[in-house]
Amino acid sequence: MSDKWDLRFIELAHHISSWSKDPSTKVGCVVVGADREIRSTGFNGFPRGIDDSLERLQNREEKYPLICHAEENAIMHAARIGVSLKDCTAYVTWPP
């Protein structure tokens, strides 16, 4: 990838991080194939079906056992829709 594309994908990951409801940490991830196609995205948050109320997100004892990393959510999303991530690159706004 070129620096121009790397910058575009990390900027997109920063935008996606704003979708997180976590009041203290916002992380985004964009997973990209070799031909610069976006295969999946994710942000830190609770898994589907788990109540993500502000009260729960502000309680560390409840939050940390449940919350998923942005890259973890991107991988789960790709698996759910049947998209291969083989040989892809993940652009993440914060190290795992």
What does each of the following model-derived ranges do?
Residues M1-P96:
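Zinc-dependent deaminase catalytic domain
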